[in-house]
Amino acid sequence: MSIKAVVFDVGETLVDETESWGDWADWLGVPRLTFFATLGSVIARGGDHREVFPILRPGIDLAAESRARQAAGRRAAVTIDDFYPDALVCLRALVEAGFVVGIAGNQPSETESVLASLDVPLALVASSERWGIHKPDPAFFAKIVTELGFEPAEIAYVGDRVDNDVKPAARAGLRAIFIRRGPWAFIQAGRDDPPAADSSIDSLDELPAALANLS
C-alpha cells in the first residue's frame, strides 16, 4: 500500500529544542550544562522529561512555575527560529510531491498557532493538549488516522523517539520513520536502527528517498 500522507512529530524532529530547554535552565538559575546532563540521565533511565525539574529544584510546582514564566514574557512554545534548517524545505517538498502533510505531537496548544503560521499547506496541525491525548497512547495515532481519512498503512509518522513515536506508530499500523537526532534518539537507539522502524534517517533531507523506498 503506497504512502499518501506524512505526519511529523515536533520536538527534535522539526524543531531544535536546545533553546527551549536552555531557557528553562536560565529561569531556574541552573547552568545549561547541568540541566542538559540531568535531562540526559532522566532519558537514559526511561523517565519522563518532567522529572528533571524536581531533581534540580525539589518541591517545584511545575504548573505554577510555567504560568510564572509566561507572565514574565518567557517563551511558552517553540518559535519559527527554532526549526531545523531542513524542516521547512522538507515539508514544502513533500507537499509539492503530492503528499498530504500534517504535524501532530506532544505539545502545548500554543504551538499550534506557530505551526499554522508556516508557509506550508498543512492538512493537520494538532497538539496533545488540544486533543487531550498524549503519545504513546494508541488513541493519539488513531486520532491521526481519523483526521486524515486514510488507511493506517497509507500514513507515515516521522519522529525522533523510539518510545513515543516509532513503537506506538508501528503498533497502530502506520509506517514508522525514525529520525536519528536529538537526545532521545541517540540515547534510546544509539547508532542502531530501532527494530520497529520501517525506515531510519539522519536528516529530513533523506526523507523523500526513504518514502520512495517504502512505496
Predicted regions and their residues:
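Asp-based, Mg2+/Mn2+-dependent phosphohydrolase catalytic module
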Residues: 1-7, 63, 88-215
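N-terminal helical cap/lid subdomain that shapes the substrate entry/recognition surface
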Residues: 1-99, 108-112
